[in-house]
From Swiss-Prot:
Belongs to the UPF0102 family. GO terms for molecular function: nucleic acid binding. This is UPF0102 protein GFO_3098. PANTHER family: UPF0102 PROTEIN YRAN (PTHR34039:SF1). NCBIfam families: PRK12497.1-3. It comes from the Bacteria.
Length: 119
């Protein structure tokens, strides 16, 4: 596996651990619908959280959250709408980004709630 893929996988594992510590219930990992993949679908109270995990080894070329592009947001929204409709869920939906910088110096996790809105 390529080094960046390993870093991404480790980032997703760290994000799941982080959310569990914050008392989120993890419902799905790597949920796929059409061309979209939602890294983590979790629930806390009556809120469904779709979390996109972005992991980098350095912020040198930009913060991890800066790498979520509009097209990806459109696909995430479509996938989560499908998930909610398919499950006939009556929940509030929130889109979060979990930005992780992980390197030899340590790990920094930033949880950005309501990172973007959908219409």
């Amino acid at each position: 596996m390529a080094e960046h893929n390993e870093l991404g996988k480790k980032g997703e594992e760290l994000a799941v651990e982080y959310l569990r510590l914050k008392e989120y219930e993890i419902l799905e990992l790597n949920y796929r619908y059409q061309k979209a993949e939602v890294d983590i679908i979790a629930k806390r109270g009556n809120t469904l959280i779709a979390a996109e995990v972005k992991t980098r080894s350095t912020p040198e070329f930009g913060n991890p959250q800066d790498f979520v592009k509009p097209k990806q947001i459109q696909q995430l929204v479509k996938a989560v709408n499908h998930y909610v409709e398919e499950g006939e869920l009556d929940v509030e939906v929130r889109f979060d980004i979990i930005a992780i910088i992980k390197n030899k110096a340590g790990t920094k996790i930033e949880h950005i709630q309501d990172a973007f809105f959908y219409f």
